[in-house]
């Protein structure tokens, strides 16, 4: 799922399955055979391939578990698997820093499409279009995109709606703000939008922030503003950061941002 490109992203190792694997391993050291038996409830009719692939993602791609003398053990602090939120933040901090993976490259392409995504009405057309336009992703197919969508939604890149993803990075942006913002800036204090974006570009490397911000990030900023988690403001004579224009939206630019203290 998060291997170097080209990687045929699989549908089977979903976030929920990978987390379930980790929580089972956390209970006690266990062999992979016993883990598969436990997760399949010893039902011979259960396809164990999804379990095997989920173990591989947790073991080899996310470093959540490790194999010691034939037994799987947890390789991270148990707090990381204590909730879907903590798990999501751990995964995000890793996968978006690996810029040579198919997952990262395709994510970056998707975010750059903006409103064009709405014309790519199914996963097959999205895969074909990307493969035609991005030489490095020419091997991409529908199954890979079907695997990508579960993790994309879980990590907060957008919302699944039928056969498409609605570009709104609200959850991804909120995670970064809640875990990283206070390390650099003060909450409840307006800072320049240019300073915020310069900082944010390093935290969201999958987003191209040169020029006008893409739709997914613009939607996230507007959503967090409406939820009073942040406040976007335009001050006279301040340098504007342009959001992706949406007709009827009251905020299409800002010069300052205030992050509210939780």
Show the residue positions of the predicted features.
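Donor-sugar nucleotide-binding helix/loop cap in glycosyltransferases
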Residues: 1-262
């Amino acid at each position: 799922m998060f291997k170097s490109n080209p990687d045929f992203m699989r549908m089977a190792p979903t976030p929920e399955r990978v987390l379930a694997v980790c929580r089972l391993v956390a209970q006690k050291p266990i062999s992979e055979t016993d883990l598969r038996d436990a997760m399949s409830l010893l039902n011979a009719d259960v396809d164990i391939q999804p379990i095997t692939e989920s173990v591989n993602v947790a073991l080899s791609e996310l470093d959540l578990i490790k194999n010691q003398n034939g037994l799987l053990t947890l390789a991270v602090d148990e707090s990381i698997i204590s909730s879907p939120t903590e798990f999501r933040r751990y995964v995000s901090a890793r996968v978006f820093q690996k810029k040579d993976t198919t997952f990262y490259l395709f994510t970056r392409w998707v975010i750059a499409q903006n409103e064009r995504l709405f014309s790519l009405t199914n996963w097959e057309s999205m895969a074909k279009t990307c493969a035609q336009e991005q030489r490095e992703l020419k091997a991409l197919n529908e199954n890979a995109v079907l695997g990508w969508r579960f993790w994309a939604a879980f990590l907060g890149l957008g919302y699944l709606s039928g056969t498409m993803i609605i570009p709104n990075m609200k959850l991804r942006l909120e995670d970064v703000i809640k875990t990283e913002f206070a390390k650099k800036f003060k909450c409840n204090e307006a800072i320049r939008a240019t300073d915020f974006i310069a900082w944010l570009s390093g935290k969201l490397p999958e987003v191209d922030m040169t020029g006008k911000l893409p739709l997914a990030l613009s939607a996230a900023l507007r959503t967090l503003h409406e939820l009073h988690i942040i406040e976007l403001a335009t001050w006279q004579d301040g340098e504007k950061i342009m959001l992706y224009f949406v007709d009827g939206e009251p905020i299409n630019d800002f010069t300052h941002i205030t992050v509210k203290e939780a």
